[in-house]
């Protein structure tokens, strides 16, 4: 359909007081599908924040649904929005951190965040701010419990109100919470007499509910480390810790759907037996459609919301669809080869849990969409808006040159930007990195600077002042009258980033993939053994992936893959190394001798350190400017 032309007098952008980026001023009311061209990498947070403000608050409904290509881009965009758009409420829906058709469940921390977001969308709390929902291709393409289910499963309690503690504990058990002796992590609960401790999804700290009979006398926040009270609450709401609840009705529905899908269950069918008994089963979320009569997607939760697609979405979608299909085929082929007496894995058809390519196309065709691209597109197209941004200056050539000082080059560039009346931000990954960079550049004539915690504070910058901000950007960018110079533009790539959670199950797979059949390994308790391969065995009525290790005399040890940290690779490639005997004393004796030797070495080191402290020598102070430059080039994150 031909997009409508905006009325006369409506330009591509309109000026907005206090913002460097001109807002989109109702342009999208006349265009269903729009592509924003020349949006440089790193500027997405600024652009999306402005789009959200243009959409405005929608009485609790999302202003934008942003689909990122992967979890890393979603994390970076979330951090960028926190800086560029602190006035926007951000909800994130991450994808499961496990493989399609896996035997493990998603990480509870990931599930808690997903459930918190879905609950907020099903029962809106924030109505005054624009709401941006961030998600990924993997998460957007996966079916979810319905909005009605999420709204019904939200539990509320108030100080002075009445509640049946026994019924509440039953609700926690059915909704994925784990009973522990001491509550420390999200999704845990503990009871002691008339006290219920609970760490609910979406909460920063756990809470303690004091019961007197069926009355909740008080609700207190407490520190999970010290267990000391830190504050009081009048009211508390929490949501399930799992997308699968195990109420009697749900168990009955699962049994009915399972039998109609796969036929009669056998004694070896551990999934069916566990759910029938009301027990949670590792990886049961991969059969989510069997627990529900109906499922929805994030597109249903964000019905009528403009969808923003990042530049790599199309490629990520193709890869995801192929990945799901490959895992399904592998499981189906393995099912045909399942030996009698082993636990079968009966995979569901992909379309039951994941959107098909046709469904994706239909969803996007029916929605109002905005695509972002860093590339220039023909400006005669009515569906293209040119943001006229570009990537920031790279100083790679200056870093490589022996006769050029990269910091002098950076100062020269900053001077050119100020001379052009640009608003300039200098961004670094951490406070320490920003301090070092500022100090070095000041030695080269940086001029006046001001620390800013978020983008609105940039309006306080006086003429010629440079803003200093902690903002994790891979590279800087220029957009309208704003120029952001990133730490990496000047110093090059840093070698360590903030820690990222690996997909559950991928850590051990990566390690196992590095082992070949016949490799020697050392178990911390049992000594040298030989790796045979991976084997799935029955443990506590459920299948478990284990590493098969053989020891002297042919004795075998099956080590669960999640305990692979107990193994190290043997330091020599010699294949004739003597294997230890399971239960023998030789390995323990060798460890004892080694510990004794380590203590002797430690004693020598302590004596050497003491002697060094007693000696004196002239103190040399490095030239301040050169030393600061050396520190600024340090490519690693400093430890605490």
Task: Go through each PLM region and give its residues.
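Conserved beta-alpha structural segments and adjacent helices that either
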Residues: 1-576, 594-595, 599-619
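Charged, low-complexity
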Residues: 580-639
């Amino acid at each position: 359909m031909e997009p409508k032309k905006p009325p006369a007098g409506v330009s591509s952008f309109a000026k907005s007081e206090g913002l460097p980026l001109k807002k989109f001023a109702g342009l999208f009311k006349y265009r269903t599908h729009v592509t924003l061209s020349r949006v440089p990498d790193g500027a997405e947070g600024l652009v999306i924040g402005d789009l959200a403000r243009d959409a405005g608050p929608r009485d609790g409904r999302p202003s934008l649904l942003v689909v990122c290509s992967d979890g890393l881009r979603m994390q970076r965009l979330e951090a960028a929005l926190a800086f560029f758009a602190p006035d926007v409420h951000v909800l994130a829906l991450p994808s499961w951190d496990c493989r399609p058709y896996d035997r493990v469940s998603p990480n509870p921390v990931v599930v808690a965040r997903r459930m918190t977001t879905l609950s907020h969308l099903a029962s809106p709390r924030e109505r005054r701010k624009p709401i941006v929902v961030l998600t990924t291709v993997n998460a957007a393409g996966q079916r979810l419990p319905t909005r009605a289910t999420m709204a019904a499963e939200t539990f509320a309690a108030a100080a002075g109100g009445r509640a049946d503690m026994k019924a509440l504990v039953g609700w926690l058990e059915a909704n994925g919470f784990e009973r522990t002796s001491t509550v420390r992590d999200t999704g845990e609960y503990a009871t002691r007499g008339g006290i219920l401790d609970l760490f609910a999804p979406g909460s920063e700290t756990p809470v303690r509910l004091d019961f007197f009979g069926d009355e909740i006398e008080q609700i207190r926040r407490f520190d999970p480390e010290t267990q000391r009270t830190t504050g009081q609450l009048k009211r508390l709401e929490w949501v399930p810790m799992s997308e699968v609840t195990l109420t009697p009705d749900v168990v009955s529905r699962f049994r009915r759907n399972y039998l109609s899908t796969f036929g009669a269950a056998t004694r070896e069918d551990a999934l069916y037996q566990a759910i029938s008994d009301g027990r949670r089963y590792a990886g049961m979320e991969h059969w989510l459609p069997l627990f529900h009569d109906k499922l929805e997607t994030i597109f249903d939760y964000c019905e009528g919301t403009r969808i923003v697609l990042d530049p790599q979405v199309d490629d990520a979608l193709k890869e995801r669809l192929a990945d799901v299909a490959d895992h399904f085929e592998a499981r189906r082929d393995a099912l045909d080869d399942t030996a009698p007496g082993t636990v079968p894995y009966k995979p569901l058809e992909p379309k039951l849990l994941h959107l098909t390519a046709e469904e994706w196309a239909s969803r996007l065709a029916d929605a109002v969409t905005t695509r972002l691209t860093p590339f220039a597109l023909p400006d005669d197209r009515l569906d293209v808006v040119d943001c006229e941004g570009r990537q920031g200056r790279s100083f790679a050539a200056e870093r490589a040159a022996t006769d050029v000082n990269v910091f002098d080059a950076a100062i020269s560039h900053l001077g050119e930007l100020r001379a052009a009346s640009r608003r300039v931000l200098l961004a670094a990954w951490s406070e320490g990195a920003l301090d070092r960079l500022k100090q070095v550049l000041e030695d080269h004539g940086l001029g006046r600077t001001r620390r800013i915690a978020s983008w609105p504070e940039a309006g306080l910058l006086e003429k010629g002042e440079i803003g200093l901000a902690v903002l994790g950007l891979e590279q800087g960018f220029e957009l309208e009258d704003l120029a952001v110079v990133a730490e990496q533009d000047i110093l090059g790539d840093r070698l360590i980033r903030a820690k990222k959670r690996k997909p559950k199950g991928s850590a051990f797979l990566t390690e196992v993939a590095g082992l070949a059949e016949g490799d020697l390994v050392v178990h911390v308790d049992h000594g040298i053994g030989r790796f045979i391969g991976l084997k799935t065995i029955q443990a506590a009525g459920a299948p478990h992936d284990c590493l098969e290790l053989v020891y002297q005399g042919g004795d075998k040890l099956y080590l669960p893959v999640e305990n692979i940290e107990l193994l190290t690779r043997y330091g020599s490639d010699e294949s004739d190394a003597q294997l230890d005997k399971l239960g023998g004393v030789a390995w323990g004796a060798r460890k004892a001798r080694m510990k004794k030797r380590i203590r002797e070495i430690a004693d020598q080191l302590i004596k050497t350190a003491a002697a060094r402290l007693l000696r004196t020598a002239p103190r040399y102070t490095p030239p301040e400017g050169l030393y600061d430059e050396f520190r600024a080039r340090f490519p690693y994150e400093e430890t605490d």
